[in-house]
Amino acid sequence: MVGKLLAPEIKSLIDARNFNALRELFREWPPADVAEVILDLPDDEQVIIFRVLPAALAADVFEYIGIEEQQNLLRAMAHEQVVGILNEMSPDDRTALLEEMPSAAARQLIKLLTPEERRIATSLLGYPEGSVGRLMTPDFIAVHEDWTVQQVLDYVRTYGHDSETLNLVYVVDERGKLIDDVRMREFLLRPLTTKVSEIRDENFAALKVNDSQEEALNVFRKYDRVALPVVDSNGVLVGIVTSDDMLDVAEEEATEDIQKLGGLEALDEPYTTIPFLRMVKKRATWLIVLFLGEMLTATAMQGYNGEIEKAAILAMFLPLIISSGGNSGSQATTLVIRAMALGELRLRDWWRVVRKELLSGFSLGLILGTIGFFRISLWQYLHIFDYGNYHWLIALTVGAALIGVVLWGTLSGAMLPFLLRRLGLDPATSSAPFVATLVDVTGLVIYFNVALFILRGTLL
């Protein structure tokens, strides 16, 4: 917001080549605001801004810019600028950039790093894709349990400038094995002669370096920490993951789930940059599956061709019946998938969900069935449409079918995520279109069987 208000002034400073004033102005701004301003400028002026910023601030601002824009800037910057920014970036943000680049380009950028930064970069990139190791940073404060509070505070003042966070201090033994994490407030509130061993309680949570990022997100939700330590297979502290990284993971997970619920494969690139053919492939796969599934609807209708010929009026209500079942199923599957994602539901809760959705499905079906019954009766009474001599039986058929189809759709939508979870698959795969397709076919069978039962001897 600040950037938009001052955009004309910034533009004037750039045109006047008053870089000193520009530098002093940006020193007073949060890096996120500077990044917002830069993205609103033409490409050549973006490079100018980075050229006048101090190296540390330039790296901080660079980290708030999207991956695509980062790559464009690196291509436009001078060699010295690229070297300075890459070496000043925090290891986790640099890893996020490098892993999104083509292998050859990433290798060239790694060569620009100092030996120490190169060692860190190659180490983090060596962990499996999607693992905690790719998210973590080795910049943290670690102390020993025989230190005093005074020693800890002196150490933090000396080496804390490069730490990702100072909210937590990690206690390790002589081999680097994690013993505990202690909040900084504990050191600030204790006498300076107090030993670390007197403060720690060994009550801590830690991530394994090969844990998935989704598992890490669940741990963060459970313990509500700003950072969590990461240990290797021997329990040695190798890094930390902070909550800002988890926010990115949560956004990616939510995006992936939404895309799957929409009936397509999750995109692994932003919508604006994904190649056309890859977009078509990811969308076509599920569309083909759903189309083949919908073909079963035509097959099912062929089985009731005789009934449709005898009572063509039944075909009029097919869209109404089928869409109601699909909509109720989509609602149920969305609710259950989200509850699973938040940890509110586990596999063992399936029976509780069945009971709840039985009542919900019946109630919703009864509401829609009642509306359908009275709609047909009212149209007949007002002479808007003539449903024939057995109009009340047709109304009863539609009402009863709606109860059955909505109940079935609700149960199907609620149980499908549990089935997929039991099979070790992602529950989000049971997307709303998939549930709707399933209920379309089965709803058709329910509708015509209800019609056969009620209308036998009259219209059928």
Where are these regions (language model features)?
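Membrane-interface segments at loop-to-transmembrane junctions
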Residues: T273-K282, R346-G361, W392, L396, ...
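Juxtamembrane/transmembrane-helix interface segments of polytopic membrane transporters
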Residues: E294, A298, Q302, L368, ...
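Alpha-helical transmembrane segments in multi-pass membrane proteins
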Residues: P31, W286-E294, F317, I321, ...
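Membrane-water interface of transmembrane alpha-helices in multipass transporters/channels
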Residues: G303-L318, I384-T397, P427-A428, L460
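Hydrophobic packing positions in regular secondary-structure scaffolds
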Residues: M1-E265
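Non-transmembrane, extramembrane segments of multi-pass ion/lipid transporters
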Residues: D245-K281, S330-V354
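Re-entrant/interfacial helical elements at transmembrane boundaries that shape
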Residues: S330-A341, P417-R421, A432-P433, V445, ...
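Core alpha-helical transmembrane segments of integral membrane proteins
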Residues: I274-A341, R346
